[in-house]
């Protein structure tokens, strides 16, 4: 049946009658799961914001106020804290799935996805700082100082973000406002990401020329996406049983500008980038490598190659990439001593080598079929 | 012949992959052990706490005794600024007991004329801080301010095990280790030299419930109390986890059935290739 309203037709064409391949497995659920977690994080975060004060003398105390005094405040904080980890788990699975199925062929989807990834990293970092614990404060000092490598404007930008000459309560206010506003921007970009995706439909492992042998997105894939609820319930159970396992003990020590922790390590989802940053003993080059570890994947969207997939070779390279990323993450939490100071640059090199090898193959494989 | 060669090379490749993976795992295991071995302190032994399991609750009797240890030993130097006496009500004490505990404490306050006074505490008061500020605390303790104990159980790597080991781990300093006056040697503390001398001794206090107050008993009880203080919601969250975990199988069954119901037509599709009259394949000439 046809509806006269063009907006309804637009939505209908994307969510109900979208032709979808029959072969989309549970790997395609990662995207909808991320949407669920994002909404969940926005809700829990909004409730936490009711009771939080971004003042350097009070921030840590208000976090504990939420834990001790606010009715069920501890639940919201546990969910918000672990929800960030859940988001990154599915984000990385989503990215790897994208690499396996060469989803960078959908250029707009890929570009918007990478942008979302960068924004979510910023969001997670700023949330990390708001706790105003020892690791928060010193992570803020280290990461914001990296911006000083920007030519000409670097020191000015750092001073602006600090709102002073060091990380202070004013910095906390700065981060709190951004931490609250950024998710809404991410939400808009996610909707754009979704629209780009559903304009073309997902890539799949089965090539199908035309739409004659496909199913409607609804109700088939809505039913499949409902499986996410089971994962979500599992997440709730694990959060309640192991609320702080993914955090550091330093998370419970109030920030002290006079004393830094023995080791400063970021959350688990930043460890690979941290390892790459530390692998290069030059500040500027380290920051550039840190950025390129993500920006490299933008280059995939510059290649026009829709059909030439070397599936087995690509699968092998993606597995190698996953292994090297995992090892880099492990290296990121090791102390700076032998043999880790040798392994970090080695695996950073492997990481970039594999990424550019995938890019090269993607560019070249088209020529094989000319 | 060709197939045999392919199979042989595949088997060889699989064997090579297996050996490589095993080597990788071995390397990671060795390096991880070296990471654990790094650091300048002894790692605490894993202890069987009553509340360690995924669905285990606190031993409230132990927590109560731990509060007695805190009040009679730790409170002389350490504050618990996030804890109020009302948190004890109907959790580890009755309301009357909590009120009595509060009344025992001397709370710094200001009277109607603005003069500083000390008054008996009430339920809404925090556990008192023995020092007016951090600098006073440091000055009274050889320059090392005793940290607040509210979150201590979560604020140290090793958690309860570390606290217990630290409190029972004092020993004579090895030859060559210089220990200043007012400090002590404890291998569990980072660096080995700790500003808090040994505080727990056999029969150092007397428990109300008659439990023998050995040093290890006191250490266990005060560790449990400190964990309870850091996580008052501990028992509630595990109860909720158990309830939701019990719910998951039913939700899963409903969702799986629903999805399979939706897909039944698609999954049971059959393709039939038949000749349509008038579109027969051409006859061989």
From Swiss-Prot, chain A:
The keyword Transit peptide does not apply. It is a multi-pass membrane protein. It is found in: Mitochondrion inner membrane. SUPFAM superfamilies: a domain/subunit of cytochrome bc1 complex (Ubiquinol-cytochrome c reductase), Transmembrane di-heme cytochromes. This is Cytochrome b. Binds 2 heme b groups non-covalently. GO terms for molecular function: electron transfer activity; metal ion binding; oxidoreductase activity. Pfam families: Cytochrom_B_C, Cytochrome_B. The chain crosses the membrane at residues 30-50, 74-96, 109-129, 175-195, 221-240, 284-304, 316-336, 342-362. The main subunits of complex b-c1 are: cytochrome b, cytochrome c1 and the Rieske protein. Its main location: mitochondrion. Component of the ubiquinol-cytochrome c reductase complex (complex III or cytochrome b-c1 complex) that is part of the mitochondrial respiratory chain. The b-c1 complex mediates electron transfer from ubiquinol to cytochrome c. Contributes to the generation of a proton gradient across the mitochondrial membrane that is then used for ATP synthesis. Heme b b566 binds at residues 94, 193. It comes from the Eukaryota. Changing residue 170 to V: In qm189; normal complex III assembly, but a decrease in complex activity. Heme 1 (or BL or b562) is low-potential and absorbs at about 562 nm, and heme 2 (or BH or b566) is high-potential and absorbs at about 566 nm. Its cofactor is heme b. Belongs to the cytochrome b family. The lineage of its organism: Eukaryota, Metazoa, Ecdysozoa, Nematoda, Chromadorea. InterPro entries: Cyt_b/b6_C, Cyt_b/b6_C_sf, Cyt_b/b6_N, Cytb/b6-like_sf, Cytochrome_b_N_euk/bac, Di-haem_cyt_TM. A ubiquinone binds at residue 198. Heme b b562 binds at residues 80, 179. Keywords: Electron transport, Heme, Iron, Membrane, Metal-binding, Mitochondrion, Mitochondrion inner membrane, Respiratory chain, Transmembrane, Transmembrane helix, Transport, Ubiquinone. GO terms for cellular component: membrane; mitochondrial inner membrane; respiratory chain complex III.
């Amino acid at each position: 049946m046809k509806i006269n309203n063009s907006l309804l037709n637009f939505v209908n064409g994307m969510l109900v009658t979208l032709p979808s391949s029959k072969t989309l497995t549970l790997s395609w659920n990662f995207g909808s799961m991320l949407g669920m977690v994002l909404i969940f994080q926005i809700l829990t975060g909004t409730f936490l914001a009711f009771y939080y004060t971004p003042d350097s003398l009070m921030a840590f105390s208000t976090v504990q106020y939420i834990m001790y005094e606010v009715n069920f405040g501890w639940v919201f904080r546990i969910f918000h804290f672990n929800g960030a980890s859940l988001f990154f788990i599915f984000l990385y699975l989503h990215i790897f799935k994208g690499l396996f199925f060469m989803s960078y062929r959908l250029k707009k989807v890929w570009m918007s996805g990478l942008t979302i990834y960068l924004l979510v990293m910023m969001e997670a970092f700023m949330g990390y700082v708001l706790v105003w614990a020892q690791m928060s404060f010193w992570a803020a000092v280290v990461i914001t100082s990296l911006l000083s490598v920007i030519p000409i404007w670097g020191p000015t930008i750092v001073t602006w973000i600090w709102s002073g000459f060091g990380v202070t309560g004013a910095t906390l206010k700065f981060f709190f406002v951004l931490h609250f506003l950024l998710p809404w921007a991410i939400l808009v970009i996610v909707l754009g990401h979704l629209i780009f995706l559903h304009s073309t439909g997902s890539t799949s492992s089965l090539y199908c020329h035309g739409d004659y042998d496909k199913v409607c997105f609804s109700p088939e894939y809505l039913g499949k996406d409902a499986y996410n609820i089971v994962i979500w319930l599992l997440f709730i159970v694990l959060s309640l049983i192991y609320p702080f396992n993914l955090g550091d003990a330093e998370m419970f020590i109030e920030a002290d500008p006079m004393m830094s922790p023995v080791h400063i390590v970021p959350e688990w989802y930043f460890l690979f980038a941290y390892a790459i940053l530390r692998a290069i003993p030059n500040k500027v080059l380290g920051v550039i490598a840190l950025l390129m570890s993500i920006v490299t994947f933008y280059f995939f969207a510059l290649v026009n190659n829709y059909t030439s997939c070397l599936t087995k070779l690509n699968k092998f390279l993606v597995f190698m990439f996953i292994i090297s990323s995992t090892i880099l993450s492990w290296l990121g939490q090791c102390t700076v001593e032998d043999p880790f100071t040798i392994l970090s640059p080695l695996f950073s090199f492997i990481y970039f080598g594999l990424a550019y090898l995938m890019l090269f193959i993607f560019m070249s494989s088209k020529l094989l079929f000319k | 012949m060709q197939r045999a060669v392919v199979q042989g090379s595949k088997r060889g490749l699989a064997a090579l992959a297996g050996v490589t993976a095993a080597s990788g795992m071995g390397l990671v295991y060795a390096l991880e052990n070296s990471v654990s071995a790094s650091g300048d302190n002894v790692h605490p032994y894993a202890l069987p706490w009553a509340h360690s399991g995924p669905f285990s609750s606190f031993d409230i009797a132990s927590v109560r005794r731990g509060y007695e240890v805190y009040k009679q030993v730790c409170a002389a130097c350490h504050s618990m600024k996030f804890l109020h006496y009302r948190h004890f009500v109907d959790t580890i004490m009755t309301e009357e007991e909590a009120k009595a505990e509060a009344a025992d404490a001397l709370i710094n306050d200001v009277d109607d004329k603005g003069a500083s006074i000390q008054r008996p505490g009430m339920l809404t008061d925090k556990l008192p801080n023995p020092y007016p500020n951090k600098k006073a605390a440091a000055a009274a303790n050889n320059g090392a301010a005793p940290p607040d104990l509210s979150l201590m159980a979560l604020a140290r790597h090793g958690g309860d095990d570390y606290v217990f080991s630290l409190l029972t781990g004092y020993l004579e300093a090895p030859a060559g280790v210089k220990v200043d006056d007012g400090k002590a040697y404890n291998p569990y503390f980072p660096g080995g030299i700790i500003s808090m001398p040994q505080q727990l001794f056999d029969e150092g206090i007397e428990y109300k419930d008659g439990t023998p107050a050995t040093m290890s008993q006191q250490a266990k009880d005060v560790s449990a109390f400190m964990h309870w203080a850091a996580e008052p919601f501990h028992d509630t969250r595990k109860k909720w986890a158990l309830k939701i975990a019990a719910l998951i199988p039913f939700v899963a069954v409903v969702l799986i059935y629903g999805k399979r119901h939706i897909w039944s037509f698609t999954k049971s599709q059959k393709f039939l290739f038949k000749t349509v009259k008038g579109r027969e394949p051409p006859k061989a000439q």
